[in-house]
């Protein structure tokens, strides 16, 4: 009888621990070089450059200076923060800096510690598909969570 009680208790404990929800935090760091390589795998060829005319997009955010690239004559910048939390602070800083500005059209892409601005300057009211947006997102989605 003692063995049966122990078996029931063990089964109950296993059942209860299986029902407990746990949050998974992805702590793996993505480097700028890994992002550039992933983009190249999706046929996005970047050229390094320095861009003054779109200064707000290449400014330091939360102490991080981004990598500046050209994609089909448009600016794309890649911020590599140390952590996702640092990236969130950078996002908030950008929102604060640009709150009262009238910016050109751009897309923001986020993945873990990475933030990308693609300054495509397309009219957002048109039905035109913005080039490279899908490919950039797919390249970032190729980084497996966990």
Where do the language-model regions lie?
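Sec-dependent signal peptide recognition
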Residues: 2-10
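A short, solvent-exposed beta-edge/loop patch
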Residues: 98-146
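Post-signal peptide N-terminal segment of mature Sec-exported envelope proteins
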Residues: 26-49
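A short acidic-to-branched-hydrophobic micro-motif
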Residues: 68-88
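Short, Gly/Ser/Thr-enriched beta-strand-loop segments that form substrate-interacting elements
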Residues: 84-101
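Secretory pathway targeting signatures of secreted, lumenal, and periplasmic proteins
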Residues: 53-74
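Bacterial signal peptide processing site
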Residues: 20-23
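C-terminal motif of bacterial Sec signal peptides marking the signal peptidase cleavage site
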Residues: 15-18
């Amino acid at each position: 009888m003692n063995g049966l009680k122990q078996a029931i208790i063990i089964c109950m404990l296993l059942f209860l621990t299986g029902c407990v929800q746990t949050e998974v935090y992805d702590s793996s760091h993505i480097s700028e070089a890994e992002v550039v390589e992933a983009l190249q795998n999706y046929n996005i060829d970047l050229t390094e450059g320095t861009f003054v005319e779109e200064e707000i997009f290449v400014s330091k955010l939360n102490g991080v200076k981004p990598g500046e690239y050209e994609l089909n004559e448009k600016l794309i910048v890649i911020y590599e923060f140390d952590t996702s939390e640092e990236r969130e602070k950078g996002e908030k800083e950008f929102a604060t800096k640009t709150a009262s500005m009238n910016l050109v059209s751009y897309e923001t892409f986020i993945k873990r510690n990475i933030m990308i601005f693609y300054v495509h300057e397309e009219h957002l009211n048109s039905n035109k598909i913005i080039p490279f947006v899908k490919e950039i997102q797919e390249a970032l989605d190729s980084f497996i969570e966990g």
